[in-house]
From Swiss-Prot:
Annotated localization: Secreted
Record has Lyase as a keyword: no
UniProt record, GO biological process: defense response to fungus; killing of cells of another organism
Organism: Arabidopsis thaliana
A GO CC annotation given for this chain: extracellular region
Sequence similarity: Belongs to the DEFL family.
Keywords in alphabetical order: Antimicrobial, Disulfide bond, Fungicide, Plant defense, Secreted, Signal
Endpoints of the signal sequence: 1-24
This protein's name: Defensin-like protein 260
Disulfide pairings: C44-C99, C63-C79, C69-C83, C73-C85
């Protein structure tokens, strides 16, 4: 009888330990997903909001403040949802042209996130 009770106690203890371990694994996965983009994590190549006064694009995840990014967008750029700077506002023959992507205008967006004349 004592052996059966001991086996049952061991089984319950093992089951409890496995359950607790599973819960802790799930909890750590959840926290990893929630914290995969920490403030000031240097994974952005641009900045939200367009430098010193361009069009303000939607604030993308992982790129909430200028300090979250490796580099800052020049005026007129903003950070895309992929945390890449894209061109937004350029001057073409003294006319302001809005360009959300390179194909919207005759200019090309450089890797730094500003528009320059296509060479």
């Amino acid at each position: 009888m004592k052996i059966a009770s001991l086996k049952l106690l061991l089984l319950v203890s093992l089951l409890f330990a496995v359950t607790q371990n599973g819960i802790s694994i799930q909890n750590s996965e959840t926290s990893v997903n929630q914290n995969s983009c920490m403030p000031n994590e240097p994974r952005c190549t641009g900045c939200p909001g367009g430098g010193s006064g361009g069009y303000r694009g939607p604030p993308p995840p992982c790129c909430k403040n200028d300090s979250d990014c490796k580099a800052h967008c020049p005026e007129g750029g903003y950070c895309s949802n992929q945390c890449d700077c894209v061109c937004n506002l350029v001057k073409v023959m003294n006319n302001d042209v809005r360009c959300q992507v390179d194909t919207d205008c005759n200019m090309k967006c450089s890797k730094q996130g500003y528009c320059k004349l296509a060479s």
